[in-house]
Amino acid sequence: MDTRFNGGVIMDVTTKEQAIIAEEAGAVAVMALERIPADIRAAGGVSRMSDPKLIKEIMSAVKIPVMAKVRIGHFVEAEILQAIGIDFIDESEVLSPADSVHHVNKRDFSTPFVCGARNLGEALRRISEGAKMIRTKGEAGTGDVVQAVSHMRQIIKEINLVKALREDELYVMAKDLQVPYDLVKYVHDNGRLPVPNFSAGGVATPADAALMRRLGADGVFVGSGIFKSGDPKKRAKAIVEAVKNYNNPEIIAKVSEDLGEAMVGINENEIKIIMAERGV
């Protein structure tokens, strides 16, 4: 299991200047994008992989690992990112899907992949395809953490259900989830996914980030919540501290002070496009 990012924050950035802010704030990695999820959602239309030139500029600006997104099922975009030396590929529902049925066969790549999931079945199917990290889908670009909470609770609930099964019941569960038996057996024996399980989608405050850690996330992705806020530098540092000290309300309270205005956000009831429904 690749645990190098565990206990850390991965931040969306659109420029090398933002990447430097993220690195200085203590981010364990950055996600290079042309537009953060809030702007992708606002613009509508078809969203695709970012310009490789932009990604390479961000890669050259920081020493921490750089990730980038590809459309679901678009293995050529993934090949491009691998060719330029990206550290991690996110097969992401935030971009417009290229294939409504198939995901990328991640086992064909030497570069590791992270994928989104709303439940245990989605998580294990992505892992069976070769994903090395799972994140909750949440609802990116909203600043509303409710879906990330829902997805994390669902995954943890289903993990606990599998833990309670008898050995002979695991085969039925594997069939129901449409995943290999050995993955279900791992969850049963270890009480967790066989890869890191991060949270993403709607995290906007230090308290949000700490909440996701308390619910069982190994780490946190933060997208629009930092660079759509009033004081990105201070908020980025505060979220990193909250993730490190997620069990300490006093520290979280201190770092939450005077952060400037948080991103305005979109209530889940106002959302027209549900990105989390892409790619099951």
UniProtKB/Swiss-Prot annotation:
GO molecular function, one term: pyridoxal 5'-phosphate synthase (glutamine hydrolysing) activity
Catalysed reactions listed for this entry: aldehydo-D-ribose 5-phosphate + D-glyceraldehyde 3-phosphate + L-glutamine = pyridoxal 5'-phosphate + L-glutamate + phosphate + 3 H2O + H(+)
Binding site for D-glyceraldehyde 3-phosphate: R153
Active site: K69
GO biological process: amino acid metabolic process; pyridoxal phosphate biosynthetic process; pyridoxine biosynthetic process
Enzyme class, UniProt record, top EC level: lyase
CDD domains: pdxS
Family classification: Belongs to the PdxS/SNZ family.
Name the UniProt record assigns to this protein: Pyridoxal 5'-phosphate synthase subunit PdxS
Organism: Fusobacterium nucleatum subsp. nucleatum (strain ATCC 25586 / DSM 15643 / BCRC 10681 / CIP 101130 / JCM 8532 / KCTC 2640 / LMG 13131 / VPI 4355)
Gene: pdxS
